[in-house]
Amino acid sequence: LLGEPVEARFGKDFPIRFDFLDTVGGGNLSVQVHPTTQFIRENFGMYYTQDESYYLLDAKEGATVYLGLKTGIDKNEMIEDLRKAQKGEIVFNTEKYVNKLPAKKHDHYLIPGGTVHCSGSEALVLEISSTPNLFTFKLWDWQRLGLDGKPRPINVERGKEVIDWKRDTEYVKQHLANHLTKISEGDGWREERTGLHPNEFIETRRHWFTKPVTHHTNNSVNVLNLIEGEEAIIESCLL
């Protein structure tokens, strides 16, 4: 099922997870950061972290994604504002510190560990990620309360240890936002790579086709998701 290269690295763990994040008619998700591989190994004994990406399945008017830090911010000031917000002393000014990007259907944003991010409102996001999902450090949750009537748990102190402060506006534009590479094309089909950051092991490819096409798994696990159209019929062929 996994293929020998994947099984050799991850054992019996299935390393890929798809989640659907629906904020259409709702609010922003929590501003958060996932730990780097080094941090999660040294502190939690795991050998890979939750790198992920956002693929926009749909986006209504005003849809946004928050990704990376604004160039030139004062990191000490940002952390202090997060601490004050956690205590209820201020409302954290997210747009002062975090890039707010307009989002449209079929956009793809890479989110390697250490990158501050969240999905904004009015978006339907396919979140493609690796599987250690217990290590999300939330930084700000827009003053929302839990079922107990108290502010939802926030982990600023852990989060500040893993934020990659070099992931600023320019870095996001150059490395994380909509980097499309054409792999190949033919009569009635086109294959594109939409994401693979050097720190990540999940490569994402997008296939457009109007007639039957053949794809090779290359001795690795492949997870498919229909992003346009009503249905696709997939048949396995043993060679």
Question: At which residue positions do the language-model features occur?
Answer:
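Glycine-rich, mobile lid/loop segments that gate access to catalytic sites or pores
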Residues: 108, 112-114
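Active-site region of the double-stranded beta-helix
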Residues: 1-105, 118-230, 234-238
